[in-house]
Design a protein with these regions (language model features):
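Sec-dependent bacterial lipoprotein signal peptides
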Residues: 1-14
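Bacterial Sec-dependent N-terminal signal peptides
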Residues: 11-40, 46, 286
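A general structural signal for stabilizing positions within well-ordered secondary structure
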Residues: 31, 60-62, 100-101
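Loop/turn elements at helix/coil->beta-strand transitions in domains of secreted/extracellular proteins
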Residues: 32-35, 63-67, 106-107
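The canonical Cys-X-X-Cys-His
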Residues: 40-51, 68
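Typically the conserved alpha-helix immediately C-terminal to a functionally engaged Cys/Sec
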Residues: 47-63
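Short, conserved sequence motifs used for protein processing/export or organelle targeting and
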Residues: 70-286
Length: 286
């Protein structure tokens, strides 16, 4: 018997360039469907940290398949207003509109891809989130539901000007009917400020996933017409934002927390308001 040995030798030439600011970042795509949770919360809401702990449990279970956003509704001032003990203002005009439109009549509550149901319009209690997430991620046979859209985000951040340019590219992965919008927002982690937790006042509580601003409007921009989209339809959106007090009143000249900020983009069907697919990426990857 003769043995034949085929040896294939490949040579790769790798060159390294020095990259200076501004920095370009892009998110990695996966085939996994992602669910967006809008958690309505408040720093004066004694039960809200329980909802935050529930979010952490769900993240341990579903990993990157969920994206949580924390919204402090300005309309529920008894939970979100500022005073001598709670000096940090987490509210924004855009998030106030969302909280009102979604039916956040008390706290804590949360939407799950903005599907209908729950106890208040589209709002569910924290103990209802898991079952709704499960139904959105998996079909009745336990198979993963396919994504409808591929959303890719690239960012360029100029550290000197605090200028952020976001390029968002969308591809429809199948023929889809109806009308769709793209929403782009900024969220921020690692904000240390007071929070009531049960009966305990915590002066140095870490607030994460905080809704900071809407980049392209509260309800975004249209990417289609009423006739829907064909498979492999492509759409590109480029937006530039200065991270200063015009974008969010907390982004003062001495603010320096860009390493804890993220871009979240999602596509929703305009008639039902139901979110189809979402993605999140750090503005500056470490």
């Amino acid at each position: 018997m003769k043995n034949y040995i085929l040896i294939i030798i490949s040579f790769f030439l790798i060159t390294c360039d020095t990259i200076e600011p501004p920095y370009l970042q892009s998110n990695n795509q996966s085939s996994q469907k992602i669910v967006l949770i809008e958690k309505f919360t408040g720093h004066k809401c004694s039960n809200c940290p329980d909802a935050t702990r529930k979010i952490k449990e769900l993240q341990e279970l579903y990993q990157d398949a969920i994206i949580p956003i924390s919204i402090h509704p300005g309309g529920l001032k008894e939970f979100t207003d500022t005073d001598d003990n709670y000096i940090y203002d987490f509210t924004t005009n855009s998030s106030d509109v969302i909280a009102s439109d979604m039916g956040a009549s008390f706290l804590p509550l949360g939407t799950v891809n903005r599907i209908d149901g729950g106890i208040s319009n589209r709002c569910f209690t924290k103990d209802q989130w898991a079952s709704e997430i499960e139904k959105l991620l998996y079909d009745s046979e336990g198979l993963p539901r396919p994504k409808k859209f591929n959303i890719d985000i690239s960012t360029v951040f100029n550290t000197t000007k605090k200028e952020l340019t976001i390029e968002t590219n969308i591809i429809a992965l199948s023929d889809v009917k109806n009308n769709f919008n793209l929403v782009i927002i900024i969220i921020e982690d690692g904000i240390i400020a007071p929070q009531i937790d049960g009966t305990e006042f915590i002066e140095s509580y870490e607030h994460n996933n905080i809704y900071r601003c809407a980049v392209n409007g509260t309800y975004g921009e249209n990417i289609s017409n009423s006739n829907g989209l064909e498979n492999q339809f492509e759409y590109q959106s480029i937006n530039t934002l200065i991270l200063n007090q015009d974008a969010n009143h907390n982004w003062t000249s001495d603010w320096d927390n860009i390493n804890n900020c993220y871009v979240v983009a999602y596509v929703y069907e305009t008639e039902s308001l139901i979110i189809q697919d979402s993605v999140k990426k750090a503005i500056i990857d470490e």
